[in-house]
Amino acid sequence: MKKKKALPSLLYLVFIVLLPWGVSFSFNKCLELWIKNWWNTRQSETLLPYIQEKRILERFIELEELSLLDEMIKEKLKTHAQKPPIGIHKEIIQLVKMDNEDHLHIILHFSTNIICLAILSGFFFLSKEELVILNSWVQEFFYNLNDSIKAFFILLVTDFFVGFHSTRGWELVIRWVYNDLGWAPNELIFTIFVCSFPVILDTCLKFWVFFCLNRLSPSLVVIYHSISEA
């Protein structure tokens, strides 16, 4: 009876895994035009935010200094005093467009992520029975394996998440999260996360192996340590 109910639960799990991508793609297409119109209207009413103005002004000053240096070299200071170089105007327009696209990207992805989280939370809340059946089926499948295979899978999972090369993977994960949310990369946060999170996770896994798994199957713990120390 449990195995018959496990198949719908597995399909439900696959649906839950694929749902965020489908929702993200659909809502990105649906919300993009609406958010773009709303943002452009808001921009026309309130002009540029302070941070946006400051960043563009800094870039403008940098370009102006470069342009002045170029004009001094070419000895065309009179032309510069009468009319600013066309290149600066083009660069300013490009900066405004790029900054506007960055803000649209942040708002769009943040809205999509909130909607995905709400939908997934609703599915988890309304489908507790399927999750309970799936959890019991996975536990039954795991307990029916012999201790050597169990130790192999545990060692594989621990090395994958907290092994020697796992730091690079966690760095890619947090960079993907930042990019998906539209946040500016912060190397300090990346370094702190990569240095601390695998250590915390490794401590939790060791606690689970020593205190929880040892009560269920002491022989499994012995095999696990024998393989890991080999």
Swiss-Prot record:
**Where's it mainly located?**
plastid
Q: Any keyword Ion transport?
A: yes
UniProt keyword list = Antiport, Chloroplast, Hydrogen ion transport, Ion transport, Membrane, Plastid, Plastid inner membrane, Potassium, Potassium transport, Transmembrane, Transmembrane helix, Transport
Q: Which GO terms describe its cellular component?
A: chloroplast inner membrane
Q: Where in the cell is it found?
A: Plastid, Chloroplast inner membrane
Entry GO MF terms: antiporter activity; proton transmembrane transporter activity
Q: Which GO terms describe its biological process?
A: potassium ion transport
Specify one Pfam family.
CemA
Reactions listed under catalytic activity: K(+)(in) + H(+)(out) = K(+)(out) + H(+)(in)
In terms of domain of life, where is this protein from? Answer: Eukaryota
Q: How does the entry describe its membrane topology? A: Multi-pass membrane protein
Query: Where in the chain are disulfide-linked cysteines found?
Result: none
Q: Where are the transmembrane segments?
A: 7-27, 106-126, 145-165, 181-201
Job description of the protein: Contributes to K(+)/H(+) antiport activity by supporting proton efflux to control proton extrusion and homeostasis in chloroplasts in a light-dependent manner to modulate photosynthesis. Prevents excessive induction of non-photochemical quenching (NPQ) under continuous-light conditions. Indirectly promotes efficient inorganic carbon uptake into chloroplasts.
Show the HAMAP family listed in the entry. CemA_PxcA
Q: Which family does it belong to?
A: Belongs to the CemA family.
Q: This protein is called what?
A: Potassium/proton antiporter CemA
The source organism is Lolium perenne
Q: Which gene produces this protein?
A: cemA
